[in-house]
């Protein structure tokens, strides 16, 4: 028996990285998992790892910058599976910038924000996109899924994936992203107060997590294993996507039935703000 047997879960941002790690741990705990991403994929990545995962999973395409696409996706999942028990708002992310005013063309391209040759317009589009994807889109998803959860038997669980960049200490090089994640932390508490007792809302604030993007855009080129980068992290390493996934399993399970409106830091005891100088060096080297 798994902790999440017979549960239907949506996980956003499952084309790679943390989203895939979360999806796999929910599958391991017995849930049926519907992943989604902007990229069109035939299946949730890695579901050939276990014999029954492919049967208990699906991958959908969804432009999370379009509330109509979110509405259509949630409606399709509810119609296909009959209910939605879990939402993990994982999609998001950004790329560090040398400063808030200077958004190089390469950074904009990597992030996937709308393009512009005008310096000011490019900066505005970059920061607007970061706030949209890391705060507004998770709110849209939560509202739509909550409506479904309230119209079915039982209770639901929503988990927002935030970041240490949202800590009040500030996050230079990640200004709009950090502001959006701080907003997501506050949103979590507010929604928990509004939507209880039928729907619980919690948040995981991630520290450094070892994904391909983290290796490419955060770890300094002269420190590929992170030995120096992680010197100020008490556990001396990055987290793994599977560790984030196991925290999600706990928050979605009956073991967390009385946990609501909280933000749990998954960061190895990292002190706020200590890693941003290294991140700035990395993006400066990249440019």
Identify what each model region corresponds to.
Residues 196-200, 259-261:
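Short, small/polar-rich loop/turn modules that mediate ligand/substrate recognition or access, typified
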Residues 29-45:
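Conserved glycine-rich Rossmann-like NAD(P)H-binding loop of the short-chain dehydrogenase/reductase
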Residues 94, 249, 260-287:
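Short C-terminal tail/terminal secondary-structure segment
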Residues 93-94, 106-126, 150-151, 159-183, ...:
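Catalytic loop of short-chain dehydrogenase/reductase
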Residues 44-52, 101-109, 206-233, 273-287:
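A glycine/serine/threonine-rich, flexible loop-to-helix segment
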Residues 233-244:
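A conserved structural motif in NAD(P)-dependent oxidoreductases
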Residues 15-17:
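Conserved glycine-rich cofactor-binding loop
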């Amino acid at each position: 028996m798994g902790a999440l047997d017979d549960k239907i879960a949506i996980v956003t941002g499952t084309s790679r990285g943390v989203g895939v790690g979360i999806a796999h741990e929910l599958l391991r705990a017995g849930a049926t998992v519907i992943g989604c991403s902007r990229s069109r994929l035939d299946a949730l990545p890695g579901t050939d790892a276990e014999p029954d995962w492919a049967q208990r999973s699906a991958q959908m395409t969804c432009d999370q910058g379009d509330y109509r696409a979110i509405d259509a996706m949630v409606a399709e999942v509810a119609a296909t599976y009959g209910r939605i028990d879990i939402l993990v708002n994982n999609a998001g992310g950004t790329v560090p910038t040398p400063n808030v005013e200077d958004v190089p063309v390469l950074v904009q391209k990597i992030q996937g924000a709308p393009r512009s040759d005008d310096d000011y317009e490019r900066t505005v589009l970059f920061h607007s996109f970061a706030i949209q994807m890391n705060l507004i889109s998770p709110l849209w998803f939560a509202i739509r899924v909550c409506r479904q959860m309230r119209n079915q038997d039982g209770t639901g669980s929503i988990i927002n994936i935030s970041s240490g960049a949202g800590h009040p200490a500030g996050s230079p090089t990640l200004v709009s992203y950090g502001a959006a994640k701080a907003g997501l932390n506050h949103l979590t508490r507010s929604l928990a107060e509004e939507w209880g007792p039928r729907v619980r809302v919690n948040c995981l604030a991630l520290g450094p997590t070892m994904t391909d993007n983290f290796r490419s855009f955060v770890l300094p080129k002269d420190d590929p294993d992170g030995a120096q980068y992680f010197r100020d992290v008490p556990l001396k390493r990055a987290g793994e996507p599977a560790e984030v996934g196991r925290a999600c399993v706990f928050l979605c399970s009956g073991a967390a039935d009385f946990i609501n409106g909280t933000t749990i830091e998954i960061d190895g005891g990292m002190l706020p703000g200590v890693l941003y100088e290294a991140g700035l060096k990395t993006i400066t080297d990249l440019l």
